[in-house]
């Protein structure tokens, strides 16, 4: 069975959480596949920067992992770190992201495509 791994961040600022909407309509957190010779933290920082243009400070002690089987039958591991914005101007990666929003926690939970 093929194994895929993605890393990203749950970004909190002023009691709001940042969600992205992918061009396929799925809402979630900024994340992406781990590249060769890249750590989980490096992947998370890179993906957040690529997808949202912001810089984050990751709390590596706050790490959440999900494991599931994809529609294609691959084993998928998603690692998310808690992070806060420390710089950059929010803008979306137009090729992959259709929308970015800061939402209160309740709205974010209701918007998430994968719960």
Language model feature labels by segment:
Residues 1-29:
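N-terminal strand-loop-strand
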Residues 34-115:
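Unchanged
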